[in-house]
């Protein structure tokens, strides 16, 4: 199957603690997670992620299987090794990727970059490349790098324990590429800016997905 990448807004979702009409559409485990969350924004994010995962699976002709978590917190379907997924959210945006091979995704809202984070977490080659950019290009480039690096660590299952600075993403040639990691040739990177949402994807497929923006409400 081709890798699917879906983006949705959480803006119109109700707080499930006030309006629980959408809760039956997500898994019992996610309902329990939502019930444990104290902040309305966190409950809406958890609900939105569950709804988007259900939508992506439905469009692929699949039902929601049970979900388990790996040692570093990566979610997976233990009964469906042929289906891999990844979820991410930022502010009022939620992103979901579904594939038949290893996949990771990340979304961030485009805004002022934080150079101190680049100094702390980016590879030296990435920092040099960023510092040479015109100021007008810096913010978008920063978030493209950040989302692609997060996506790679999610796809590998390493999470942040893998170290954002331990490998390099090269954006200089137009097509994102991985460097300084032994499995670089296995992975394909995809980056897209949709409105204010910077979306990154790392997967072991060989085709770039088309980002679909969808509504979460029935």
What are these model-derived regions, one by one?
Residues 1-218:
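Core catalytic alpha/beta fold that binds nucleotide/phospho-ligands
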């Amino acid at each position: 199957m081709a890798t699917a990448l879906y983006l949705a807004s959480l803006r119109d979702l109700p707080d499930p603690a006030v309006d629980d009409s959408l809760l039956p559409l997500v898994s019992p485990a996610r309902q329990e997670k939502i019930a444990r969350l104290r902040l309305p924004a966190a409950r809406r994010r958890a609900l939105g992620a569950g709804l988007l995962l259900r939508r992506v699976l439905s469009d692929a002709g699949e039902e929601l299987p049970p979900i388990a978590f790996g040692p570093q917190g990566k979610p997976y379907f233990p009964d469906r090794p042929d289906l891999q997924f990844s979820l991410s959210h930022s502010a009022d945006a939620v992103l979901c990727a579904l594939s038949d091979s290893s996949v990771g995704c990340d979304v961030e809202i485009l805004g002022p970059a934080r150079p101190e984070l680049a100094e702390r977490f980016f590879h030296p080659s990435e920092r040099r490349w960023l510092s040479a950019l015109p100021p007008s290009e810096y913010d978008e480039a920063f978030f493209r790098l950040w989302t692609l690096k997060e996506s790679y660590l999610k796809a590998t299952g390493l999470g942040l324990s893998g170290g954002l600075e331990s490998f390099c993403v090269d954006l200089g040639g137009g097509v994102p590429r991985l460097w300084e990691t032994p499995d670089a040739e296995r992975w394909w990177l995809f980056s897209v800016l949709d409105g204010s949402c910077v979306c990154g994807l790392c997967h072991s497929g060989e085709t770039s997905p088309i980002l679909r923006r969808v509504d979460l409400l029935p």
